[in-house]
Amino acid sequence: MGQKINPYGLRLGITTDHVSHWYSDSTRPGQRYADYVSEDIKIRSYLTKTLDRAGIARIEIERTRDRIRVDIYTARPGIVIGRRGAEADRYRLELEKITSKQVQLNILEVKNPETTARLVAQGIAEQLAARVAFRRAMRKGLQSATSAGVRGIRIRLAGRLGGAEISRSEFYIEGQVPLQTLRASIDYGFYEARTPYGHIGVKVWIYKKPSVRGRTEGGG
């Protein structure tokens, strides 16, 4: 099972935290659980499409009664903030239009993009779109992650690799990636490369350390 599903599915509350922090049992329109889920999807969709080149690692959403806090973790905060914060203000106003609520936007820098699965996947996808050989792009992703000190990394590509007539998948693995060990802190990322031959899916699993709620294996 651990090999087939999204690794976050079984690890929420163990090594992985939720990316949406709110609760609703209201029956009032606009405050129902389904309304909040729909709003979250719209917020994430808008930001990921608009900030495609900003290296977005993850987006966290927290709600109060009449306010939404959105934390954007990015490898390129300058693109999101803009000159004197002009771009950040524009995104915040657009989110307020989408949600009809007051929005607090926080931009946080990702210190180690080489060890963040989604950013590694995006880097490989950008190389594929620039017509770099897929095996070379995969090896570069492996080398940058292992040199940054991760315990293991697995990269899987699927699609018309190298412009082949028939689509196929190929993966490389370096070190340990124990997907069935729930105490293993596994970071997972997915990105699609848009190539002249069609889309190629890029999946990355990064094994950082074994832990349970902040306690490392063998530690006190």
Curated annotation (Swiss-Prot):
Molecular-function annotations in GO: mRNA binding; rRNA binding; structural constituent of ribosome
Keyword annotations from UniProtKB, A to Z: Ribonucleoprotein, Ribosomal protein, RNA-binding, rRNA-binding
GO BP terms in the entry: translation
Residue ranges of domain KH type-2 in the record: 43-111
CDD domains to which the protein is assigned, alphabetical: KH-II_30S_S3 (cd02412)
GO CC terms: cytosolic small ribosomal subunit
Pfam name, any one: KH_2
Tree of life domain: Bacteria
Role of this protein: Binds the lower part of the 30S subunit head. Binds mRNA in the 70S ribosome, positioning it for translation.
UniProt protein name: Small ribosomal subunit protein uS3
Source organism of this protein record: Tropheryma whipplei (strain Twist)
Gene name, Swiss-Prot/TrEMBL: rpsC
